[in-house]
């Protein structure tokens, strides 16, 4: 059965939802699923903006057949070539062999790499700032390289103010998009903050003209557009959303966890209302990365393991580096029963491998567990965190 939605009078959502996929990109848990968005423009000429993952191809074709109602598909606009959006290209070409493909040079190169038969079809290669008319609707193509692949572009329908934004402004989950927006951006495109800043600057002249944002994942945005755009601006500058403390602990037998909880209590006693605590072993790293983008301060509490950093904590550090987390104030708590090494190793990683991370001099160092004689260290660290908030 077809399932379509009107975005505007002439633009239809014809995509598909996937509630079977458990790991997005085979890496990120998506318990609420994901949507693959595709948009069909009905004008003097018809145009499909991107396709969907292979798993949603049948639904896409059924939706398109319903909206087209016997009309041919004239154009296929490809903004992004990642397989979860390009997976149905070949079926589109088989169903509508006379369709003209509109995209850019790098995208056509990638289509050939993925073995799509583009050489057998008419193509229109566009460049930055080019325009194209489908009749009533005139669109402008704006290149957005590395948001988050090199071939990415966005398409702006100047007639109705619709921005087809590729993966930008997308979210995990089929519903309640705002809830998952930070987690999506920080993990999927978070590494490329400078490139997001570039596309935001390019879009500066048309921001007041945008009435709809149509991403390739998640809901279409029709309200509070500037709120969402400002969030993207903050995240892509690697600025925290708010002053607060995120405590991440690695604990084998509960002793490091107990110390982390004690620090959280001290911070709350001193008036800090925004404190979040996470077990690095039981929290998916994508959630940790998302929360790291939210808070100004980070506490890393790790047991020493085989004379190194606990593996799950090390993995978290590596992910922070890979996704370009920066400009945070960090406090360290370390534990070990005979060789307390984790603190120095974490500090070395933060100093040498990451950008603009301010590591507080104050530290809590424990031998097996937190004892009363370490209460002063705990109090001093809590005071240092609070003072650094000023």
Task: Locate each region found by the language model.
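Active-site neighborhood of phospho(di)ester-bond hydrolases with catalytic His/Asp-centered motifs
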Residues: 49-51, 73-81, 101-104, 163-167, ...
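Short N-terminal or domain-adjacent regulatory/targeting segments
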Residues: 212-241, 315
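FMN-binding flavodoxin-like domain, especially the glycine-rich phosphate-binding loop
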Residues: 175-213, 217-220, 262-276, 288-390
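Conserved beta-strand hairpin/beta-sheet module of binuclear metal-dependent hydrolase folds
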Residues: 4-65, 154-157, 161-165, 256
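Structural motif
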Residues: 45-47, 75, 137, 161-164, ...
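Metallo-beta-lactamase
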Residues: 5-9, 103-152, 195-198, 202
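Active-site-proximal loop/helix segment associated with metal-binding centers of metalloenzymes
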Residues: 148-152, 168-193, 238-241
């Amino acid at each position: 059965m077809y399932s379509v939605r009107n975005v505007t009078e002439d633009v239809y959502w014809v995509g598909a939802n996937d509630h079977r996929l458990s790991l997005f990109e085979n890496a990120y848990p998506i318990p609420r699923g994901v949507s693959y968005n595709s948009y069909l423009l009905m004008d003097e000429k018809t145009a499909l903006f991107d396709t969907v993952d292979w798993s949603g191809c049948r639904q896409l074709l059924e939706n398109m057949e319903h909206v087209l109602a016997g009309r041919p598909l004239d154009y296929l606009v490809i903004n992004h070539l990642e397989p979860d959006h390009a997976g149905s290209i070949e079926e589109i070409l088989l169903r509508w062999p006379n369709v003209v493909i509109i995209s850019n040079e790098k995208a056509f190169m990638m289509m050939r790499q993925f073995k799509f038969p583009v050489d057998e079809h008419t193509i229109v290669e566009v460049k930055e700032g080019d325009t194209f008319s489908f009749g009533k609707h005139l669109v402008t193509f704006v290149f957005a390289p590395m948001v988050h692949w090199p071939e990415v572009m966005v398409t702006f329908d100047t007639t109705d103010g619709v921005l087809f934004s590729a993966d930008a402004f997308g979210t995990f989950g089929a519903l309640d998009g705002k809830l998952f927006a930070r987690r999506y951006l920080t993990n999927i495109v978070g590494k490329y903050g400078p490139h997001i800043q570039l596309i935001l600057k390019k879009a500066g002249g048309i921001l007041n003209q945008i009435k709809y944002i149509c991403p390739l994942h998640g809901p279409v945005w029709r309200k509070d557009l500037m709120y969402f755009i400002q969030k993207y601006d903050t995240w892509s500058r690697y600025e925290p959303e708010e002053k607060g403390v995120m405590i991440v602990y690695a604990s084998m037998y509960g002793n490091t966890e107990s110390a982390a909880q004690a620090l959280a209590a001290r911070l709350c006693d001193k008036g800090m209302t925004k404190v979040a605590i996470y077990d690095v072993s039981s929290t998916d790293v994508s959630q940790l990365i998302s929360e790291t983008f939210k808070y100004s301060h980070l506490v890393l509490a790790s047991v020493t393991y085989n004379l190194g950093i606990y593996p799950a904590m090390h993995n978290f550090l590596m992910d922070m580096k890979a996704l370009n987390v920066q400009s945070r104030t960090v406090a360290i708590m370390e534990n070990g029963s005979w060789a307390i090494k984790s603190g120095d190793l974490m500090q070395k990683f933060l100093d040498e491998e990451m950008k603009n991370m301010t590591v507080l001099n104050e530290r809590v160092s424990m031998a097996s567990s937190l004892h009363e004689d370490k209460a002063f260290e705990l109090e001093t660290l809590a005071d240092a965190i609070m003072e650094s908030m000023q």
